[in-house]
Amino acid sequence: RELRKKETARANWIAGVSHDIRTPLSMIMGYAGHLLGDANLTDRQKKELDVICRQSQRMKNLVNDLNLASKLEYNMQPTDLEEINIVAVVRQTVVDFINTNPEEKYPIQWLTEDSLGICLVEADKGLIGRAAGNLLQNSINHNPEGCSIYVTVEKDKDRCRIRVEDDGQGITEEQLEKLNHEPHYMMCDENVTGQRHGLGLLIVRQIAQVHGGTMQIGHSRYGGFEVII
């Protein structure tokens, strides 16, 4: 009971800090966005404001990820379980991702068999979509020069698998060992070594576990990184 109280207090503290950060951050983003609309700005000023907007959005995403990771870790994230079609959810996530990230150096290929139109499971639609989106973003984050991303939904008896892989730079055997056996390695600062996989993958693992599943990390058949949930 005492441990549970400490876990709840920690989760509430993180939620409070997240809220306190989001409020001034929203003001910074709002003012920066407003200033960007000024026709009298010099090119340098536009670039600097654009950096402020992008980095503020990045910080906001990190705060949201930290809050979600904390709630998932301490079973404080409400789950809305319903019968969903995993194929449709992941396909829509891919479509939304393409529409909001139109960079040509990150083409996404949908490799799910045409015959697999439906794969029904009891799951939280929002969390499954979040997990798939995090995997797509992970490939982009770790391949700044670009890569092709391959998405497959597979059915195995009464379970569904989501496979996201790329043909990017991949990871070493040492990094793979740490990612598979030391979950908190995924949270380490990316400045410490050349390859880190922050809160995004940790959240994917937590979402899989909430649904009674697992996350497997490995080398892609295309030469890059692969994650299966």
Q: What are the roles of these predicted feature ranges?
A:
Residues D166:
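Acidic ATP/Mg2+-coordinating residue in the GHKL
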Residues Y74-T79, I118-A123:
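Conserved micro-motifs of the catalytic ATP-binding
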Residues R54-M59:
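Short alpha-helical segment of the dimerization/phosphotransfer core of two-component systems
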Residues N138-I140:
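Short helix-loop "hinge" at the ATP-lid/N-box region of the Bergerat-fold HATPase_c
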Residues T100-T112:
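Short conserved segments within the C-terminal catalytic ATPase subdomain
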Residues G212-G213:
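Conserved glycine-rich
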Residues I171-C188:
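Short conserved segment of the HATPase_c
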